[in-house]
Regions:
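Extended, low-polarity transmembrane helix blocks
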Residues: 1-29, 46-56, 60, 67-153
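Membrane-interface interhelical connector segments
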Residues: 28-45
Length: 153
């Protein structure tokens, strides 16, 4: 990534994270209402397990995106979570509102795929870790050259 991509990458991660963090927070604040809605959409078995799984994935994945920590993994988990979620909750295409939500979710999955492919950018925990590892590797290589010369013997 070039020098101009750090800030847009950070802002993109924040915007993607926001919807997951807010959705997870709202689920956490209204467990009964959320589970009743899940049941009304046909999720009648192990609803509590699915509820807590959704809360964990949305908040955990949202934090992963926000801080850029284990970002590719967080984006992958969120994208995989969104596939069945989108098909279960937004597949009534005769309702224009549901079609909009379906397409919005597809766009979010696309954004998550972009994060999986190109990573979190420099302004992230992962980016700092990668730079620290690279700097350490460069210092080791420079010390090796200083001691042993270019031939390495």
């Amino acid at each position: 990534m070039d020098q101009y991509s750090a800030l847009p990458s950070l802002l993109g991660r924040i915007l993607l994270a926001a919807i997951f963090l807010l959705s997870g927070y709202h689920k956490l604040m209204d467990p009964q209402g959320t589970q009743e809605f899940m049941i009304s959409m046909g999720m009648t078995t192990v609803t509590t397990l699915f509820y807590w799984g959704a809360v964990a994935i949305e908040i955990g994945g949202g934090l992963s995106l926000l801080f850029g920590f284990m970002t590719r993994t967080g984006a992958l988990v969120l994208a995989l979570f969104m596939i069945p979620t989108t098909l279960i909750f937004h597949s009534n295409f005769s309702d224009p509102n549901q079609m909009v939500h379906f397409l919005k979710n597809l766009a979010m999955i696309g954004g998550l795929m972009y994060v999986m492919t190109y990573g979190p950018g420099r302004l992230s925990v992962d980016g700092r870790s990668r730079r620290a590892l690279l700097n350490e590797s460069l210092m080791v290589a420079q010390e090796h050259r200083r001691r042993y010369g270019e031939t390495g013997t």
